[in-house]
Amino acid sequence: MALTLARPEGNGPGGGNLALFYLETRDANGALNGIRIERLKDKLGTRKVPTAELLLDGVPAEVVIGTRDGTRHIAPMLQITRAWNSVTAAAFMRRGCALARAYAHERSAFGAMLAELPLHRETLADLETETRAATLLAFELVELIGREEAGDIDDANRALLRLLTPIAKLLTAKQAVATVSEAIEAFGGAGYVEDTGLPALLRDTQVLPIWEGTTNVLALDAVLRTDAASGLAAMRARVAAALNGAPAAVAGAADLAVRALEHAEAWLAATKDRNALQTGARRFAFTLGRALELALLVEHARWALVRDPVCDAVQTARRFAATTIDFIRDGDHGG
């Protein structure tokens, strides 16, 4: 079965006049049910998931709900697929890190194992930090979706879910491309050889900022949404909860997360020009996402220290805090 958007006869142009339909892709004999494959697309990656141009001619289909507003009705599915995208991004990052770390303990250079070279260790630590941040953000989104599906979510968390969905998807996807690329570079020339499987990992990762809404589309979704204020209030509350009781060792990181979030909120409140909002949408979304990631790393450090006083969670939070968290440009409010 499949769900598809189509324009019922008599409906005018525009996305609002599309309807959501249910159809069965094969008939009782197992043949395609009025669906003709025009061509398979020759893609950069994800070749195990074929993409095709299809012609639907005489396919039996049933309207799911109403004959208009199909895009709005299909939105819950987009929420799930964007969460999948975020989790996949974290998974690809973890695989890249694991491979690079394992290789560092097998490959020697300059008379020592790569894992013993200070600069290589620093590089691997940076990759690990981004991976942990992305993982925490992805599963923050997963938790909110789980609460919504279980009927155990209040209005504030529902607003946070709506805002976090595009932000988590766009940020983790960007982090994945950068992290996997760097992890492959850690193999040197071997990372560029097809039979290692590493180039395929990079190609598959590259689709993540494209699938389920590009970075620009999702950034605009975050900044222009009518309920942005309630979403920001909920995010502020979530950050405050994450930072409550933060260990002294990560107090600076906690303060940075708060200041970045406040800066983004102030920019949104001061920016009335729609063109300026669109111009700054990426910086706004990246700031919200990385501020929340930093807060989640601080929260994790607090939790981890109770269980293992010598864990590296504090160092991870502090390392992440040393990266760019606040992307907002002062004075970029338009006229």
Language-model region placement:
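C-terminal amphipathic alpha-helical interaction region
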Residues: 238-335
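Generic, well-ordered alpha-helical scaffold segments in large soluble proteins
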Residues: 5-8, 21-24, 55-63, 77-80, ...
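Alpha-helix capping/hinge segments and adjacent helical runs
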Residues: 162-238, 307, 319-335
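N-terminal leader/propeptide and maturation segments of large enzyme subunits in energy/redox metabolism
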Residues: 120-131, 138, 147-154, 244-253
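Secondary-structure capping and boundary motifs in well-ordered enzyme cores
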Residues: 45-48, 82-85, 116, 120-133, ...
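C-terminal helix-coil-helix/basic helical segment that borders enzyme active sites and/or dimer interfaces
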Residues: 132-169, 185, 265-281, 299-311
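A short core secondary-structure module
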Residues: 1-34
